[in-house]
């Protein structure tokens, strides 16, 4: 059951949550007023000044982070996926993040969309911001990791968080200029225990693309096919755009992807328009390179800079055609780029790396 906002932009706490807060700090009830039998409203005016629980509890949590008492802290990862659909990339992303946080010593729970507001004791919320907004509880440390759909997040929403991580250096720099809350760049990453090199001859394809259409004929596939290249495609919705003999399947399980990535000669990658415009590099780039895969991607700056030029990008259909032909005929060049890219990812872009970055950033936060 989700919290709501009323007309005066006050935060609504449902009765069970209110009772929990009241028990922890009886003084808080003076800041609450009844609206009906099911809801209590806490005034949003000078939020941190009025919420006595937040005033004292957040510094205690921060002190434990600074002193590395991670085993005394519980982290809730708010995953955007619904319980009924665990094929979303967010679901696997959440579990990889959980594993790395637990290695660090934290107690970690994953809350899928329907369980975001369950009555559980939490110290730190890490919200993987995708399609839906999360209405935060101010007595906990709240972290947003904006990994997709940046066009759907307002400045007002960002400002409610103690720290905001953005999976794009370009967008993070834009937000730093106009937000008061702390903003840091935190790119996506990979789990090398899930994505690693493992070639299988029966999965060897010249050119592979994995992804759904969302009712859009994705440009990199369109450009490749119109130039006469044979692309093996896995994903939902392609019947509308291409011959069925090119469609190899609708879905590859996440724990099988590494075999397909490792075995193909060229993996094609692209970005949705909002991600490309704001330079959010796809998680597929990290996963594929961890498998030692050669990748050609649409042209975004971070695809080149993050991986030291070991991702090949293209400008238009003619450029793509030339690069596909060249690299199919030069396996040594493919392997050289893939090997260097893998080394960069394993050294710099794993979930363990990102958890270290998150913890160091949390140590520096201040409560406004």
PLM features: residue spans?
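Alpha-helix C-terminal capping/helix-to-coil transition sites in glycosyltransferase folds
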Residues: 121, 160, 262-263
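N-terminal pre-catalytic "stem/leader" segment of glycosyltransferase-like enzymes
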Residues: 12-138, 163, 171-178, 184-185, ...
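Conserved catalytic-core segment of nucleotide-activated headgroup transferases in glycan assembly
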Residues: 86-92, 99, 192-263, 272-276
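Catalytic binding pocket for nucleotide-activated donors in carbohydrate/polymer assembly enzymes
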Residues: 70, 75-83, 91, 95-96, ...
């Amino acid at each position: 059951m989700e919290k709501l906002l009323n007309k005066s932009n006050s935060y609504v706490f449902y009765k069970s949550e209110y009772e929990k807060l009241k028990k922890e700090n009886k003084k808080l009830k003076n800041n609450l007023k009844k609206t009906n039998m099911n809801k209590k409203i806490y005034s949003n005016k000078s939020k941190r000044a009025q919420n006595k629980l937040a005033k004292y509890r957040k510094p205690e949590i921060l002190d434990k982070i600074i002193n590395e008492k991670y085993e005394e802290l519980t982290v809730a990862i708010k995953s955007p996926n619904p319980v009924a659909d665990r094929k979303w990339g967010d679901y696997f992303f959440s579990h990889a993040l959980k594993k790395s946080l637990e290695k660090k010593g934290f107690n970690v729970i994953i809350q899928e969309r329907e369980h975001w507001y369950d009555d559980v004791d939490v110290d730190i919320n890490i919200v993987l911001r995708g399609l839906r907004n999360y209405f935060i509880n101010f007595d906990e440390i709240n972290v947003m990791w904006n990994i997709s759909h940046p066009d759907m997040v307002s400045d007002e929403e960002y400002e409610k968080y103690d720290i905001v991580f953005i999976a794009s250096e370009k967008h993070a720099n834009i937000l730093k200029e106009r937000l008061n809350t702390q903003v840091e760049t935190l790119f996506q990453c990979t789990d090398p225990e899930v994505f690693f090199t493992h070639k299988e001859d029966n999965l060897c394809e010249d050119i592979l693309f994995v992804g759904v259409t969302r009712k859009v004929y994705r440009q990199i596939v369109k450009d490749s096919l119109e130039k006469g290249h044979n692309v093996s495609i896995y994903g939902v919705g392609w019947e509308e755009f291409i011959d069925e003999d090119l469609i190899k399947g609708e879905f590859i399980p996440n724990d099988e992807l590494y075999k397909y990535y490792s075995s193909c000669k060229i993996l094609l990658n692209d970005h949705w328009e909002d991600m490309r415009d704001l330079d959010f590099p796809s998680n597929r780039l990290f996963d594929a390179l961890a498998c030692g895969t050669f990748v050609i991607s649409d042209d975004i700056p971070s695809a080149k800079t993050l991986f030291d030029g070991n991702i090949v990008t293209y400008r238009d259909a003619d450029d793509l055609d030339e690069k596909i032909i060249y690299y199919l005929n030069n396996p040594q060049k493919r392997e050289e780029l893939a090997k260097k890219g893998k080394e960069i990812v394993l050294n710099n872009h794993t979930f363990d790396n990102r958890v270290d970055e998150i913890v160091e950033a949390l140590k520096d936060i201040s409560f406004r």
